[in-house]
């Protein structure tokens, strides 16, 4: 199951209700974690051992779902990343805002 972050929920509501304009990110990036990200943009993303977020592209949504339109491949780990079980989609290659998160 996946969820939108508080940041994205607020941006979409403000955009729909004409109290702010949401600027779509130029690119989105997939990040990984060993536990759930939280709606408030907290959580512990992987670090070190050759880890970095990877850019992803997605097809247009249909019936409330979408999927990545190309493989998202992470570089080989140079040490343990632990048991990766969760993903986050972010609006920047580092830092930035969590948009969507969920478990594998």
Go through each PLM region and give its residues.
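Small cysteine-rich, disulfide-bonded extracellular modules of the LU/uPAR three-finger superfamily
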Residues: 1-87, 91-104
């Amino acid at each position: 199951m996946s969820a939108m972050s508080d940041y994205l929920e607020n941006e979409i509501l403000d955009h729909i209700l004409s109290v702010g304009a949401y600027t779509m990110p130029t690119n989105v990036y997939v990040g990984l974690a060993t536990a759930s990200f939280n709606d408030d943009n907290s959580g512990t993303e992987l670090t070190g051992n050759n880890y970095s977020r990877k850019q992803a592209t997605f097809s247009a949504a249909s019936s409330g779902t979408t999927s990545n339109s190309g493989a998202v491949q992470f570089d080989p780990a140079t040490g343990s990343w632990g048991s990766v079980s969760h993903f986050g989609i972010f609006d920047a290659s580092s830092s930035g805002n969590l948009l969507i998160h969920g478990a594998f």
